[in-house]
From Swiss-Prot:
Pfam family, one: UbiA
GO function terms (MF aspect): 4-hydroxybenzoate polyprenyltransferase activity
Gene assigned in the entry: trt2
Subcellular localization: Membrane
Record keywords, A-Z: Magnesium, Membrane, Transferase, Transmembrane, Transmembrane helix
Record has Transmembrane helix as a keyword: yes
Protein name stated in the entry: Polyprenyl transferase trt2
Stated role: Polyprenyl transferase; part of the gene cluster that mediates the biosynthesis of terretonin, a fungal meroterpenoid that acts as a mycotoxin. The first step of the pathway is the synthesis of 3,5-dimethylorsellinic acid (DMOA) by the polyketide synthase trt4. DMOA is then prenylated into farnesyl-DMOA by the polyprenyl transferase trt2. Methylation by the methyltransferase trt5 then leads to farnesyl-DMOA methyl ester which is further subject to epoxidation by the FAD-dependent monooxygenase trt8 to yield epoxyfarnesyl-DMOA methyl ester.
Record field: catalytic activity: 3,5-dimethylorsellinate + (2E,6E)-farnesyl diphosphate = (3R)-3-farnesyl-6-hydroxy-2,3,5-trimethyl-4-oxocyclohexa-1,5-diene-1-carboxylate + diphosphate + H(+)
Membrane topology: Multi-pass membrane protein
Length: 342
């Protein structure tokens, strides 16, 4: 069977579909789609492009959000560890955990699209994704998903055994996420599993997260708050169409107070980050750069994005630049603390 076979109904989508779906806004077909002539997708062979789209390699925001917590986790652990950690070990863990975050993001996108295929056909922003438009068969997508998660499992062999437990928690919630919108108004809260990157990074460096329970918890709340804040703002783009097809989310449930909700998560993140460092004795470099950079980057993101309206096409680009800027400042503050203690 050709790998790019035309789609029939997906067994997964038949089981996990809404019973009250209206007629599609416009059913997606391959002829509706034109590949972008710019960006990374334009440089790939035509046979590879649908798979690259499935993994969202042209949408780096998700990769930032999945990889940056591991980067922060390594930097934070270096700054608070009871003994000075060698730079070579830190670099090794940074590379392995970044690859793990990349694979979890990639596999999660493919899995999400497998489960949401029929729903994606109803939403204008997603109806031309590779699975809904028939560019990839469900079987091929499922096989690719399994291979990606398998590669992630192989990476765990390079880390201490405790990391396998933490990786299992992260993977479980990643697989659960696409079902959240069917059963709850709070699917974004499932994304807090990404915050488990902090204890996983600590364990990878053989620093027990339970030795510092309050600071570790604060850092997890910090990461979770940032992830949910960005996802709530981003989800507002689809809120109206989600209402029509019965999809549930915090953006739908709290559509009248999205601004207040987003700012609430922003302040939660800033306070938790501050506590996570102060409880471990981090000082001025951390407060000025890590906390100050967080406030500057994401306060600007919210003021501009919510000011323009959450349906603005610039939401993703604003989130991407803010996340990248904030990550640089987070790591810089921790790195300066690490140097001061070395």
């Amino acid at each position: 069977m050709p790998i790019l076979a035309p789609l029939g109904p997906s067994p997964l989508s038949e089981v996990f579909t809404y019973s009250n779906l209206p007629s599609p806004v416009e059913m997606a077909t391959g002829k509706d789609y034109r590949h972008s002539k710019a960006g990374i997708l334009s440089k790939l062979p035509p046979s590879i492009k649908p798979y690259a789209e499935l993994l969202r390699i042209h949408r780096p925001l998700g990769y930032y959000l999945n990889i940056s917590p591991y980067v922060v986790g390594v930097a934070y652990t270096a700054a608070i560890a009871p003994v000075s950690l060698p730079a070579t070990v830190l670099l090794n863990r940074l590379i392995i955990l970044s690859l793990w975050g990349f694979l979890i993001r990639s596999g999660g996108c493919a899995w999400n699209d497998l489960i949401d295929m029929d729903i994606d056909r109803q939403v204008s922003r997603t109806k031309l994704r590779p699975l809904p438009r028939g560019a990839i068969s469900p079987t091929s997508a499922a096989l690719l998903t399994a291979i990606i998660f398998g590669c992630g499992g192989l990476l765990l062999l390079l880390l201490p055994s405790q990391c396998t437990v933490e990786a299992g928690i992260i993977l479980f919630f990643a697989l659960l996420y696409p079902f959240g919108k069917r059963f709850s108004d709070y699917p974004q809260l499932i994304l807090v599993n990404i915050a488990w990157a902090i204890p996983m990074a600590m364990s990878s460096l053989e620093v027990d997260p339970l030795d510092f329970p309050y600071s570790t918890l604060s850092m997890c709340i910090f990461i979770a708050s940032v992830i949910v804040m960005i996802d709530v703002v981003y989800a507002c783009q689809d809120a109206e169409e989600d209402k029509k097809i019965g999809a549930r989310s915090m953006a739908v449930r709290y559509s009248d107070i999205t601004d207040q909700l987003a700012y609430g998560f922003f302040f939660s993140g800033a306070i938790s980050l501050l506590l996570g460092g102060v409880l471990r004795g981090l000082g001025l470099p951390f407060i000025v750069f890590s906390v100050g950079g967080h406030i500057f980057g994401f306060l600007r993101f919210l003021s501009v994005t919510l000011g323009e309206g959450t349906k603005s096409a610039s939401v993703e680009s604003r989130a991407k630049s803010s996340c990248l800027l904030a990550t640089v400042f987070w790591v810089l503050g921790f790195f300066l603390e690490y140097l001061a203690r070395s």
